[in-house]
Swiss-Prot record:
Record site: Cleavage: R231, N232, R241, E242, R247, A248
Coiled-coil spans in chain: 484-518
Organism: Rotavirus A (strain RVA/Pig/Mexico/YM/1983/G11P9[7]) (RV-A)
Record-marked site positions (Binding to sialic acid): R101, S190
Keywords tagged on the record: Capsid protein, Coiled coil, Disulfide bond, Hemagglutinin, Host cell membrane, Host cytoplasm, Host cytoskeleton, Host endoplasmic reticulum, Host membrane, Host-virus interaction, Membrane, Outer capsid protein, Viral attachment to host cell, Viral penetration into host cytoplasm, Viral penetration via permeabilization of host membrane, Virion, Virus entry into host cell
Protein name (database record): Outer capsid protein VP4
């Protein structure tokens, strides 16, 4: 059978990995690598580890531990801890608001009996009685008075092993530390005009922001980090903390290095990125209540903006990756609203924006290093899209929000019909937010992400601002253009080739002779006979087959087989562990949702249509796994593909893998499969439709989903080449025997050929309809 080609592609995909491995080993053994650093390597040894480059940034990053600074008198900023690191005993800091608070801190060495000592406090000699009963720890005491002529009182001692102390002005109070390390805590003194309190430090000190108070407490209790305790750390003047205000030129060109022929230029640029999403909405056939696809697609946007008085023309191309496929099925009736697939971007998705402008930075963007960029975030909120039904209220998909966060930048190329542009690709990761999206008049609600229905929400564009910096190797003569690696500057875009090839393939459907098609569908086509219509050597044919398998193993069909294999493995292991589970021959089989059925028997599907649709997803895979003598949809699909490949004038080795994979997924989308049990036939379609009938009368009978599931497991699955509608029409107009009905139900190729040779218009019309569904 012609569908042997698809089965070979499914079973032989492992050869792709083997081929890649052999190719890599051969390349590694055969390649000679010569490293010539050149005059721009910064060092005579290769390979060169290039740095990140300079990016002008107005954002100030506040250090955790700022200092040490030399002793001085200053007005500490509020909400900042002044961490004192004294080396000898005595007064370490004092401060006053000159009104009602004079406060000083004194350090006393260990093991001091009660004694009188004289200290210089605020320019006066003051005698105080002090002591330190600890044998190992140093003692900090606060002394304060509330009037200029009053007496000092002692407060809040701190016994410290690291010999560190801290003070902070905040919220009308002066905060200090007290207690015993390593369990010291903060205390405070109330004061008026606290923000005007000047302090004099008599030892080195550090500055720590209040939001890092936990770190400050850690230092008080356990000491400074080791790097601060080396002799190489030298205190500097507090004036070093002052900011010199200069006007930065963000948009500038800097010559990094230069020789007679080449120079390295660093380009720093402000950029404004404007972009928008595009989508494809495809309505399914029928009465107008079904939609087959709502998906994102790339779009290029051209705009102008002003940068430092210069008008810039820019291009952006926006695309998405890692989309999530959702679907909605309102029921099995032709008038039930349904969406086969609609795409949503969420946290696991990425947005790519390729940016190019007509400035000097992009003119020679071929050899680039030290590429860096800083961009803002942007929030994208979806709008509303109404599904215009022939009758009744319109369902409306509305809402959805994602925020784009910059996640990297790389070099890329934007392709147009006439020129290829070296550009930058900005990658954005996503987070979801409110509002969620929903479809009115359905149960779809409170879902998060941005659906493809109306991602721009009537906006002309979204906008992101930021900066970029890069170093580019360019000719020393500015009039020269950097030579490009290849000589072809205008590239035939692969997507454009595929578009033209799809149009050609679809037009060739009229030229296929049905009798030849049936014969071709019965041939055991393998991969090489399938592709023999392309003029190429044997080696090229082998390479082509490998390329087809590389692409095919990423197809939806191959992914479904892989998922099914995993599910069967899970089922086998689960059955062996549980004696309460029914055998795999029952409806909880690999051809239903086996892993779900095994792990949660109590969970059942609510409606017959949903159960049937769940099983129907597996029917094609079951048919591939259990080949019968009858003809199937894949036989016709492969035969049509072979015929069109032979007739095509545009097929090439580069487009063939895409075409073969796309054909396996999109040819004959409206498939119905059947199983036969004596005189009863059960049919289920990929669209969720299901029915049962008797062979002799074609009268419908109640559909037993449990019986259908059991039959799918135990009986062969047959492609409904001749559907029930055609069979009824054939019986009413020509009359057929029960045996002929059985043969047509089994898709017997011999009987089909007889009807076609007899020019039976009903059978011919059905086969022609299937051929016309073989579209890309």
């Amino acid at each position: 059978m012609a569908s042997l080609n698809y089965r070979q592609l499914l079973t032989n995909s492992y050869t792709v990995n083997l081929s890649d491995e052999i190719q890599e080993i051969g390349s590694a053994k055969a390649q000679n690598v010569t490293i010539n650093p050149g005059p721009f390597a910064q060092t005579g040894y290769a390979p060169v580890n290039w740095g990140a480059g300079e990016t002008n940034d107005s954002t100030t990053v506040e250090p955790l531990l700022d200092g040490p600074y030399q002793p001085t008198t200053f007005n500490p900023p509020t909400s900042y801890w002044v961490l004192l690191a004294p080396t000898v005993e005595g007064v370490i800091i004092q401060g006053t608001n000159n009104t009602d608070r004079w406060l000083a801190t004194i350090l006393i060495e260990p093991n001091v009996q009660t004694t009188n000592r004289t200290y210089n406090l605020f320019g006066q000699q003051v005698t105080l009685s002090v002591d330190n009963t600890s044998q190992t720890q140093w003692k900090f005491i606060d002394v304060s008075k509330t009037t200029l002529t009053g007496n000092y009182t002692q407060h809040g001692p701190l016994f410290s092993t690291p010999k560190l102390y801290a003070v902070m002005k905040f919220s009308g109070r002066i905060y200090t530390y007290n207690g015993t390390t390593p369990n010291a805590t903060t205390g405070y003194y109330s004061t008026t005009n606290y923000d005007t309190v000047n302090m004099t430090s008599f030892c080195d000190f550090y500055i720590i922001p209040r939001n890092q108070e936990e770190k400050c407490t850690e230092y008080i209790n356990h000491g400074l980090p080791p790097i601060q305790n080396t002799r190489n750390v030298v205190p500097v003047s507090l004036s070093a903390r002052e900011i010199v205000h200069t006007r930065a030129q963000v948009n500038e060109d800097i010559v990094v290095s230069k020789t007679s022929l080449w120079k390295e230029m660093q380009y720093n640029r402000d950029i404004t990125i404007r972009f928008k999403f595009d989508r494809t909405i495809i309505k399914a056939g029928g009465l107008g209540y079904k939609w087959s696809e709502i998906s994102f697609k790339p779009i290029t946007y051209q705009y102008t903006y002003t940068r430092d008085g210069e008008q810039i023309t820019a291009h952006t191309t926006c695309s998405v990756n890692g989309v999530n496929n959702f679907s909605y099925n309102g029921g099995s009736l032709p008038t039930d609203f349904a969406i086969s697939r609609y795409e949503v971007i969420k946290e696991n998705s990425f947005v790519y924006i390729d940016y190019w402008d007509d400035s000097q930075a992009f003119r020679n963007m071929v050899y680039v290093r030290s590429l860096a960029a800083n961009l803002n975030t942007v929030t994208c909120t979806g709008g509303s899209y109404s599904f215009a039904l022939p009758l009744g209220n319109y369902p409306v998909m509305t809402g959805g929000t994602v925020t784009l966060h910059p996640a990297g930048v790389t070099l890329s190329t934007q392709f147009t019909d006439f020129v290829s542009l070296n550009s930058l690709r900005f990658r954005f990761r996503l987070t979801v937010g409110e509002p969620s999206f929903s479809i009115t008049r359905t149960r779809v609600s409170r879902l998060y992400g941005l659906p493809a229905a109306n991602p721009n929400n009537q906006r002309e564009h979204y906008e992101i601002s930021g900066r970029l910096s890069l170093i580019s190797l360019v000719p020393s003569n500015d009039d020269y253009q950097t030579p490009i690696m290849n000589s072809v500057t205008v590239r035939q875009d692969l997507e454009r080739q595929l578009g033209e090839l799809r149009d050609e393939f679809n037009s060739l459907s009229q030229q296929i002779a049905m009798s030849q098609l049936i014969d071709l569908a019965l041939l055991p086509l393998d991969m090489f006979s399938m592709f023999s219509g392309i003029k190429s050597t044997i080696d090229a044919a082998k390479s082509m087959a490998t390329n087809v398998m590389k692409r095919f193993k990423r197809s939806n069909l191959a992914s479904s087989v892989s998922t099914l294999t995993d599910a069967m493995s899970d089922a086998a292991s689960s059955i062996s562990r549980s004696s309460s589970i029914r055998s795999i021959g029952s409806s909880a089989s690999a051809w239903t949702e086996v892993s779900t059925s095994i792990t949660d028997i109590s969970t059942t599907v609510d409606t017959v249509s949903t159960q049937t649709a769940t099983i129907a997803k597996r029917l094609r895979l079951k048919e591939i796994a259990t080949q019968t003598d009858g003809m199937n949809f894949d036989d016709i699909s492969a035969a049509v593909l072979k015929t069109k490949i032979d007739k095509s004038a545009q097929i090439t080795p580069s487009t063939l893998p895409e075409i073969v994979t796309e054909a396996s997924e999109k040819f004959i989308p409206n498939r119905t499969y059947r199983v036969i049990n004596n005189d009863e036939v059960f049919e289920a379609g990929m669209d969720g439709k299901f029915f049962a009938y008797r062979v002799d009368t074609f009268d419908e009978i109640p559909f037993d989903v449990q019986k259908f599931a059991d039959l799918v497991t135990d009986s062969p699955v047959i492609s409904a080449i001749i559907d029930l509608k055609t069979l009824k029409n054939l019986k009413d107009n020509y009359g057929i025997s029960k045996q002929q009905a059985f043969d047509l139900l089994r898709s017997d190729p011999k009987v089909l050929r007889e009807f076609i040779n007899q020019n039976n218009p009903i059978i011919r019309n059905r086969i022609e309809n299937l051929i016309m569904q073989c579209r890309l």
